[in-house]
């Protein structure tokens, strides 16, 4: 009986102790909860959507003949600016307002020994020093080489010219010989501004086709013109022909017929040169033709006609809503800066839809009297526009083309 009583007392003691411990734990837990602040529920972390492409725009300035040989070289070497001399007033044309400048380089660029300016003037065999290119590339994005002087140092000189341009990162297109079909047109990678859906912009590259045609000594063949069609089903095309009689205010029928053929062949714009004078313009089938832009950087000084020129201010734009493949085109544009690249094949293989670009045109006047090119005065610009018949032509342009 005594043993049973002791067992019962021990069991009761254990039960009481356990109850006390449980109660103590409860008190401690309540105290801890009371002391701890209640943490609010954390909101779910969301990543804002990436902005999408809304539009693309590129603003170009296209000039006429550019040349730094002969007397320009003499003036440069006599100046403080040396190789920068031909370009030292180009800031007047507000380069920062443009994505690219494109012009006609009317001279082979070689390291060949140079003759005197008098001999070069007599023979009209041009040869320009590559020492000017580091300065030229600060301004010019691309050159056409389709003219009557790029062969003046032979085919080797033309090949060396391309090599020097490659080394400086300047793009080019066209050939002295219009029957070398593979050299006529080139897909250029041109800087562009990409508008995004959040209202910001970024830099991009837009692939556009430029075709150069030399037609001074013979009109390029129908087969040569047909090269445009290889590209125009996919790309917007700008043609820069070099042809026609010199020192004339109007094109002859042979020239106008050829320029019409370029539009008929698929070109969206035709911007000509060679006559050393500004010539008239035309709206042909809703497309702009400028028959001659005139001398931009050149050493001719003998009258007002050869010292003035027109540069075409050209803005090309497209909205994403009108271009289902716009991002793919921008990606392609990053790959098109090399000469004879495969951008046409890439666009074909990807089955891209041709960009329906809107064109807006304006005119900037230049004057190189006083042995240096500079911006034309308002009066000079008005005279240039009258020669171009600019207002009438722009009024005639319809559809996607507009201007001022």
Listing of model-derived features with the role each one plays in the protein:
Residues 2-22:
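N-terminal Sec-pathway targeting helices
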Residues 42-43, 53-55, 250, 305-404:
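A short C-terminal boundary segment appended to hydrolase-like catalytic domains
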Residues 45-154, 161:
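N-terminal catalytic scaffold of extracellular/periplasmic and nuclease hydrolases
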Residues 69-71, 109-112, 148-162, 179-185, ...:
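Active-site environment of divalent metal-dependent phosphoester hydrolases
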Residues 73-88, 123, 187-240, 246, ...:
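Binuclear metal-dependent hydrolase catalytic cores centered on His/Asp/Glu-rich metal-binding motifs
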Residues 98-111, 147, 207, 231-250:
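Short acidic, glycine-rich surface-loop motifs adjacent to enzyme active sites
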Residues 112-135, 235-267:
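Active-site-proximal segments of metal-dependent phosphoesterases and phosphodiesterases across multiple
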Residues 139-142, 253-312, 318-322:
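Conserved beta-sheet core of the metallophosphoesterase superfamily
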């Amino acid at each position: 009986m005594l043993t049973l009583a002791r067992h019962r007392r021990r069991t009761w003691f254990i039960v009481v102790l356990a109850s006390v411990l449980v109660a103590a734990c409860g008190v401690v837990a309540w105290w801890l909860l009371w002391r701890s602040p209640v943490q609010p529920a954390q909101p779910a972390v969301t990543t804002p959507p990436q902005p999408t492409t809304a539009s693309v725009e590129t603003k170009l300035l296209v000039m006429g003949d550019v040349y730094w040989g002969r007397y320009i070289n003499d003036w440069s070497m006599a100046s403080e600016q040396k190789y920068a001399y031909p370009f030292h007033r180009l800031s007047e044309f507000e380069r920062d307002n443009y994505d690219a400048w494109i012009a006609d380089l009317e001279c082979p660029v070689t390291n060949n020994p140079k003759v005197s300016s008098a001999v070069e003037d007599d023979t009209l065999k041009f040869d320009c020093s590559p020492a000017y290119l580091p300065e030229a590339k600060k301004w010019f994005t691309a050159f056409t080489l389709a003219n009557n002087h790029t062969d003046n140092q032979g085919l080797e000189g033309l090949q060396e010219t391309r090599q020097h341009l490659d080394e400086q990162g300047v793009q080019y297109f066209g050939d002295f010989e219009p029957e070398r079909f593979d050299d006529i047109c080139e897909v250029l990678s041109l800087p562009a501004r990409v508008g995004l859906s959040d209202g910001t912009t970024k830099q991009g590259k837009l692939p556009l086709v430029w075709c150069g045609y030399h037609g001074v000594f013979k009109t390029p063949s129908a087969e040569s013109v047909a090269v445009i069609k290889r590209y125009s089903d996919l790309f917007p095309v700008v043609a820069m022909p070099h042809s026609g009689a010199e020192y004339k205010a109007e094109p002859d029928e042979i020239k106008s017929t050829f320029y019409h053929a370029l539009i008929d062949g698929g070109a969206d714009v035709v911007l000509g040169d060679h006559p050393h004078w500004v010539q008239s313009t035309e709206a042909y089938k809703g497309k702009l033709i400028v028959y001659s832009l005139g001398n931009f950087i050149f050493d001719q000084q003998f009258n007002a006609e050869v010292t003035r020129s027109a540069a075409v201010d050209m803005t090309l734009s497209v909205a994403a809503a009108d271009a289902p493949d716009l991002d793919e085109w921008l990606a392609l544009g990053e790959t098109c800066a090399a000469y004879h690249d495969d951008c046409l094949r890439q666009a074909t293989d990807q089955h891209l839809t041709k960009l329906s670009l809107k064109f807006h045109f304006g005119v900037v006047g230049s004057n190189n009297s006083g042995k240096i090119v500079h911006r034309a005065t308002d009066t000079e610009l008005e005279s240039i526009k009258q020669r171009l018949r600019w207002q009438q032509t722009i009024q005639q342009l319809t559809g996607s083309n507009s201007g001022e």
